[in-house]
Amino acid sequence: MSENGFLFRFRDGQTYMDTWPERKELAPMFPEQRVIKATKFAVKVMPAVAVISVLTQMVFNNTAGLPQAIIIALFAISMPLQGFWWLGNRANTKLPPALASWYRELYQKIIESGAALEPMKSQPRYKELANILNKAFKQLDKTALERWF
């Protein structure tokens, strides 16, 4: 199986969710924060919704409603998977030119501050942007970030 395989998208989505900095400054510019919040909520709540939808039909001995309850349960179980899938696709998407130049500027700012980074990517993806943003928020002071936020 290649790195672009089906299951790798889910793994990349989970990694990207953990990597993306949850900062209020980024919320208006990127949908990641909303998707991450919805995915975390779905991971907590949707398994219970799936179980309750099936169990209520079984408790009330409603065999006619059981197929619909199973469909609802499958949909509820798929909700967190949809979030991980979206995040995995987003993590591996190349940055548009404007964001790529922003990535390069942030990279140079962090290097100038004396931090060690992995080599700059020629065609960065959103997961590299997430790593750079994390480093920027941790290493740079607020005055250095004023230009962008």
From Swiss-Prot:
**Membrane topology annotation:** Multi-pass membrane protein
GO cellular component annotations of the record? plasma membrane
InterPro entries under this entry? UPF0208 (IPR007334)
Tell me any Pfam family this protein matches: DUF412
Keyword Signal belongs to the record: no
Localization recorded for this chain is:
Cell inner membrane
Task: Spell out the coiled coil positions from the record.
Answer: none
Task: Spell out where the chain crosses the membrane.
Answer: 41-61, 69-89
Keywords (A to Z) from UniProt: Cell inner membrane, Cell membrane, Membrane, Transmembrane, Transmembrane helix
Q: Is Transmembrane found in the keyword set?
A: yes
Return the similarity comment: Belongs to the UPF0208 family.
Its recorded name reads UPF0208 membrane protein VF_0838
Per the UniProt entry, what species is this protein from, by scientific name?
Aliivibrio fischeri (strain ATCC 700601 / ES114) (Vibrio fischeri)
